[in-house]
């Protein structure tokens, strides 16, 4: 099994299913590697330059498929995700494209099903299964790769009620994230599991901007 490939980025292309592929030339051999959309955008600006891509290979009846990542941590998290029943390679890539590594690990560890379900193809039941099967593993895994914790936030139930209420009131997701980040700096409020109090404080804060 390959650990990584080092070569020249020749091209980035997107197929009819919307999946991104990197053509990486290594010693006169062009490898076609599926990569997350975020990484594809970065690589598109670096065509013709040497690249170090961490890979996961998957053998199927119709051939060998390669999936590429910018770091060993991203590749390892991909492997953790596809170990869960019902999460295939495309679901794992969708999760990695929707959330940053720290955000994704945090969402799983804290069982934030709403955050996980933002990824295309990931429903509530799949999000619950992810948290159930991986939360203890990823708590230790995060320390191994020295991934930072995301900023402190209200618990998942409060977060969901708060976000849904503010969305219903017409606020944008960027405004909501900013308000939650600001309110989460209050250590006393963080200990409060009353969603109504969070909502009241958030509306007050947003009305001042």
Swiss-Prot record:
InterPro entries, A to Z: DNA_helicase_Holl-junc_RuvA_I, Hlx-hairpin-Hlx_DNA-bd_motif, NA-bd_OB-fold, RuvA, RuvA_2-like, RuvA_C
Assembly and binders: Homotetramer. Forms an RuvA(8)-RuvB(12)-Holliday junction (HJ) complex. HJ DNA is sandwiched between 2 RuvA tetramers; dsDNA enters through RuvA and exits via RuvB. An RuvB hexamer assembles on each DNA strand where it exits the tetramer. Each RuvB hexamer is contacted by two RuvA subunits (via domain III) on 2 adjacent RuvB subunits; this complex drives branch migration. In the full resolvosome a probable DNA-RuvA(4)-RuvB(12)-RuvC(2) complex forms which resolves the HJ.
Gene Ontology terms describing biological process: DNA recombination; DNA repair
One example GO MF annotation: four-way junction DNA binding
Keywords for the protein's UniProt record, in alphabetical order: Cytoplasm, DNA damage, DNA recombination, DNA repair, DNA-binding
DNA repair is among the record's keywords: yes
The protein, known as: Holliday junction branch migration complex subunit RuvA
Originating species: Picosynechococcus sp. (strain ATCC 27264 / PCC 7002 / PR-6) (Agmenellum quadruplicatum)
Primary location: cytoplasm
Domain notes: Has three domains with a flexible linker between the domains II and III and assumes an 'L' shape. Domain III is highly mobile and contacts RuvB.
Compartment(s): Cytoplasm
Transmembrane segments: none
Domain III: annotated span: 154-209
